[in-house]
Amino acid sequence: GVGNFDPAIRSIRDYTAMQFKDFVQDKIPVLGICLGMEMFFAKSEEGKEKGLDVLGGEVVLLPNNMKIPHMGWNSLDIKKESKILDGVDNGSWVYFVHSYRVKPLDEQIVVANADYGISVPAVVENGIYFGTQFHPEKSGKVGSLMIRNFLRVCKK
């Protein structure tokens, strides 16, 4: 959800002596929402702490010529099939509150973008890792469907 990169990363590291990757062991599906998704990456311009680095890439500030934070509804441009986007129509509207965007090393993990003057990766999926830059919990029926889809993945 909403927060700052460094305190969020420290809270995970302080929670357990195990490394995050060792804890989930490529078996436990993980959904990162907004900051949670950003924490999947190696580093963020927002802080000095190392990210979880389960998805290669970095997190960068939205360009300063844009209104920051990006707050409000925006539509999804779905690029490929995704387990959490099952049944979600291309062009569906979702709710964003963010100042940063992810820059994955592997663009293939981006399954949907949003247009905010630039293309913003809105949904990423790679193995057990699922991330949304927007807030599905604030995105009405579409967001509820995505959360149900994720829970279905968890049941398998």
Positions of predicted regions on the chain:
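Short, surface-exposed beta-strand/loop micro-motifs that present aromatic residues
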Residues: 118-125
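Pocket-forming structural segment of enzyme catalytic cores
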Residues: 42-118
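Histidine-centered divalent metal-coordination motifs
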Residues: 34, 98, 135
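Short amphipathic alpha-helical segments and helix-helix/interface helices
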Residues: 17-21, 85, 147
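Beta-strand-turn-beta hairpins that frame and shape the catalytic cleft
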Residues: 91, 125-129
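Cysteine-nucleophile active-site neighborhood
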Residues: 2-72
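Acyltransferase
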Residues: 132-156
